[in-house]
Amino acid sequence: MPGSALHEVFLPAERSMVTAPAQPSPLPRPALDSHTHLDMIDLPVPEVVAAARAAGIVRVVTVGTDLTSSRWSARCAAEHAAVYAAVAIHPNDTEAATGPGRLPRDPRAPHASVSPPAVAPLTAGEVLAEIEALACSPRVVAVGETGLDYYRDHAAPDVQRWWFREHIKIAKRVGKALMIHDREAHADVLRILEEEGPPDRVVFHCFSGDVPMVKQCAEAGYVMSFAGNVTYRNAQPLRDAAAAAPADLILAETDAPFLTPVPNRGKPNEPALTADTLRCLAEVKGMDLAALCDAVTATAQRTFGPW
């Protein structure tokens, strides 16, 4: 998720004025969307999953950003065979994490306006304890998205860093992958990982680093997940990074409903469009598309576990 809930989301009234994205042609081999937000997509989960499968995207990881959406993601994964979950407090939400949080979104009416119930704020320890409990579920494959976001000022950097360290500890205790949100914070993210000792499996979601950072991540064995912005005309530095990334350390994602890839940019994003990003990555890397799909699937199973 590139920021917080303030980012553009296609609401029902808006969607009627926006042409639905063109369905990609099916991939030659199955692959997955390693990072999406099904609770923010204005479609029923079964419909989203069916469209993804038609495009060759057979697995989806839906990601929590606060306690409420993490609960929702874990429950969604338990109810849908093609869906897995990640749970955490997004860096932009760390200062608000001890308040009531936003309500869960019903996939049948994900943007319904409902007043939150009056509840006593939780302590940071209570929030983290529930994140850890959720992370122990077999359908939860990662602790994330956590990390640092210095682009926005929704939470002070020192607060973000404290929560990031706590999430690293949880990922190591529960033996799950760590899914990182890193926006304009590369040096601090890498430093904190080194200071804390990284979990066995680390994923940089929506990778935004340059070629030197690719080399640092590759040396550490960190996985780099590329989103739809790699297809944008002004994203040549990101394509250079993707070209330099080892094929066995790459994943693809939508981060839906954000960052819709070309040729559907400006339309609602959804997991099916991971196929467009994979086609771009195959071209950038000079790889056969089927071979890249197989490599991404192998990396996903090594990172998140077999399915």
Which residue ranges define each predicted feature?
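Mid-domain alpha/beta scaffold segments of enzyme catalytic cores
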Residues: 1-307
